[in-house]
């Protein structure tokens, strides 16, 4: 059976991400890696994160990418001035610096294509993966894209999940919270990697699904 790993919010921490994948996970061609979004912004090397994912795919590794609210803001900033202002205030300025451009309109097409191909939801036999969570008060939670990208607190509808495990990121939580979570819905994997100077935060987490084990790398960016 192939190994399955789910990785939390990276936010431009490319060195930390590379260490997690190459040294801690020791990625294999048979693995399935799911990333929960927010690859960019705030951290020092958004470009490096995306380049690494593209490189892994080109080498034949199985990397699946969800869309985070930061990728959504980047895409919306192409056409919406308010979204652009919000994105820049929330770390988009560091992303542009990393890509070596002053405007989203100057971003290389391969990066825009990467962001546009990210998925709102990934479902497997055992998992429902989203960036932020699900709004179970909606008649169809999987169609509420706003909530999928932005929701913070949400009660779980176990009947709706029907035995699947809901895993998300988006809302940074301290290490003690992340490692003490029971193996049941919802599991939050956002350890606030980019906030390494904030006590209790600053770790990038991955979940080895079938072994039910967390893997942690402290921010080295």
Segment roles from a protein language model:
Residues 89-188, 192-202, 209-214, 219-220:
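Acidic, His/Gly-enriched loop-helix segments that form or flank divalent-metal centers
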Residues 1, 28-31, 60-62, 125, ...:
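A general structural motif
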């Amino acid at each position: 059976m192939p190994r399955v790993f789910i990785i939390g919010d990276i936010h431009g921490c490319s060195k930390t991400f590379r260490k997690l994948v190459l040294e801690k996970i020791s990625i294999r061609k048979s693995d399935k890696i799911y990333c929960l979004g927010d690859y960019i912004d705030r951290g020092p090397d958004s470009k490096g994160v995306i380049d690494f994912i593209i490189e892994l795919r080109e080498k034949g590794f199985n990397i699946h990418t969800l869309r985070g609210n930061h990728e959504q803001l980047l895409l919306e900033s192409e056409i919406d001035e308010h979204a652009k202002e919000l994105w820049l205030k929330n770390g988009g300025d560091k992303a542009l610096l990393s890509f070596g451009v002053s405007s989203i309109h100057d971003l290389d097409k391969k990066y825009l294509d990467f962001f546009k191909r990210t998925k709102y939801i990934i479902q497997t036999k055992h998992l429902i993966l989203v960036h932020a969570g699900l709004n179970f008060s909606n008649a169809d939670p999987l169609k509420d894209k706003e909530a999928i990208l932005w929701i913070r607190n949400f009660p779980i509808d176990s009947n709706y999940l029907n035995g699947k495990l809901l895993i998300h990121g988006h809302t940074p939580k301290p290490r003690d919270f992340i490692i003490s979570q029971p193996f049941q819905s919802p599991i939050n994997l956002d350890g606030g990697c980019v906030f390494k100077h904030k006590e209790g935060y600053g770790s990038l987490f991955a979940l080895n699904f079938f072994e039910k084990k967390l893997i942690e790398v402290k921010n080295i960016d």
